[in-house]
């Protein structure tokens, strides 16, 4: 079930499958029927279903990959005793512990929870200015922005986003459109 509009594009999903060498079936659920039927509220969500169609495990959020693999192997062995499985995947789980990094930050009007600017964050065309001080784990905008339920789009140049983040290894952005993006750390 796609979280972002670009994830609904079959060509993008196919490119990701190719890039990461995924050789198992991948379903593209643009109508969110799986999401709706399972009353899901989280990305990512993992549902393990046994050979009889019974949901045997549900996991919300990242991490716990070794447990998920162990459970998958158990379900495969229960469905087919004596099955020969390849060796278990051995990868370090680098999921940060809760509270050690800045939570996911969304600029969409319906999902924003950590806006640290002085203005109201609302849909439509709005003018923003960076506050003199930005609290940890919050973001602020500067310039003219068009805010909607998919995200925030600069309405005029220059426009900027400031994020006071805590990270262990990386910061990820989901962006679209045309133009130049500059990233400055501690600057």
Where is each model-derived feature located?
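Structural microenvironment flanking redox-active thiols in thiol-disulfide oxidoreductases
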Residues: 1-19, 30-34
